[in-house]
Amino acid sequence: MRCWVLAVVTAVLWSQCIPLGWAEGRKVPKRLKEGAPQHTEAFNTTLSNSEELDGSPKQVGENQRVDPLGSWMDFVKRPVGNFPGKCRKRKRPLPGPPGPPGPPGPQGPPGAPGAEVTQEVLLREFKEMIKEATERRAAVDRPSEPSQLPTALITLEGMTSYRRIEEAFHCKLKGPVVVDKKTLAELQNFQTPPAKGAFLRGTGMDQSTGRFTAPVTGIYQFSANVHIDHTEVKRSKSQLRARDNVRVLICIESLCHRYTSLEMIVGLESNSKIFTVSVHGLLELQAGQYTSIFVDNAAGASITIQNGSDFMGMLLGV
């Protein structure tokens, strides 16, 4: 009787366990399939020695929760550079066109005031412009072959060197002047010849007295050509001595020994009837001082200064 009761209970229990086992068998694979992509383990899960030695995969229980911190640590500690091939071969997108320009910035502070432009600076720049323009024009107009009449190119600097001479003269003696023996005579009575070429500029030259008075202090150039007739000396040739000579001087204030003078000494041994004594040089005159020509006859007979003897002078500079 007992055996029959046990057999009935066993059969009932067996009939109830078969459907439950079949359902569990269908559930477990689906759960494993869903959990395959996210295989994580609890941060505080401890494995036994037998589980560590066994290489079988771990099975997560149904009631075991996933640790977020452990999952994050696994993500952080993943190997770098192990990306799929598709990500590595993907081309970066090209940059787009540049955007519109931004608005202008604020105005900066005012600069320092410029240099003061004076009249001298403007004049110097104007001279440089004229010089450059003249050089360019000369380079363009220069002929390939030399011509007989070259074009005169006068620059602004060159014009300053050809300034007008305010004081200058060229006059000649009107008539003959006799100078006695052992006599120092001053030549006077000059005139400006009517022929072209002679000139008289300024008011410094007094032709009646033969004296030129300096209007300003400066350097002056003087020249004199004195034509001498020594016929009387030749007639008395027996009396001619070695010390007989004629001196022509251009003196300052008629003081030939006190001031520097221009001097020329000539002997009387010439065979010609008339000879010329020329003297020229530079003198510095103060304003108001005058110069004139003196003839010193040291011979034993008189001599005659011929008309046409000339006296020239000009102001070189202050």
From Swiss-Prot:
Oligomer and partners: Homomultimer; disulfide-linked.
Keyword terms: Disulfide bond, Glycoprotein, Hormone, Secreted, Signal
Signal peptide: 1-23
Family named by the database record: Belongs to the adipolin/erythroferrone family.
Pfam families tied to this protein: C1q
Transmembrane regions listed in the UniProt entry: none
Highest taxon in the source lineage: Eukaryota
GO cellular component terms given for this protein: extracellular region; extracellular space
Localization (cell): Secreted
Molecular function (Gene Ontology), one example: hormone activity
Glycan-carrying positions: N44
Task performed by this protein: Insulin-sensitizing adipocyte-secreted protein (adipokine) that regulates glucose metabolism in liver and adipose tissue.
UniProt GO BP: regulation of D-glucose import
Keyword Glycoprotein among UniProt keywords: yes
Domain C1q: 162-318
Family matches, as InterPro entries: Adipolin/Erythroferrone-rel, C1q_dom, Tumour_necrosis_fac-like_dom
Region named Disordered: 45-115
Official protein name in the record: Adipolin
Key word tRNA processing present: no
Composition bias type Pro residues, residue spans: 94-112
Cystine pairings recorded for this chain: none
Major site of localization recorded for this protein: secreted
